[in-house]
Amino acid sequence: MVIGTYISIITLNVNRLNAPSKRHRLAEWIQKQDPYTCCLQETHFRPRNTYRLKLRGGKKIFHAIGNQKKAGVAMLISDKIDFKIKNVTRDKEGHYIMIKGTTQEENIAIITIYAPNIGAPQYIRQLLTAVKEEIDSNTIIVGDFNTSLIPIDRSSKMKINKETEALNDTIDQIDLIDIYRT
């Protein structure tokens, strides 16, 4: 990535945004942090409620939501980054959204994921396999994977199961780097 300046990205599991007071506190906090991009997981919006997430100033808001009041992800992109959107891909259950575009003449893709509580490693592995042709060195993947990928993230002596090992193999094959673990 040869972007002349930095790109600030915040990712948060918001654990439901149905309460107005929580939405207002979140909006104020995001305004104060002033990131270029903010990725939210577990918004729990229904299709008719996405308008409830509002921010002052120039922010484009994209949602991936299911029919039930669970899961849900959102991505907020500031106008100050001059991000030209080329493509938005999302699933119907509200577990991921991928936005591809350009900034400073560089192609960039941002994916935010909220993996289901049950079968998270398998879900993420299938998703990464499905979008691997879209992933390159200018792809940023954030979110709540609902699984511990390495032993340091696990309590006591819990072992990594076969599904997580398969996910780690997929991550290695696609050549993804966990910036928090390098």
Name what the model sees in each region.
Residues 1-182:
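A shared catalytic/ligand-binding motif for oxyanion handling
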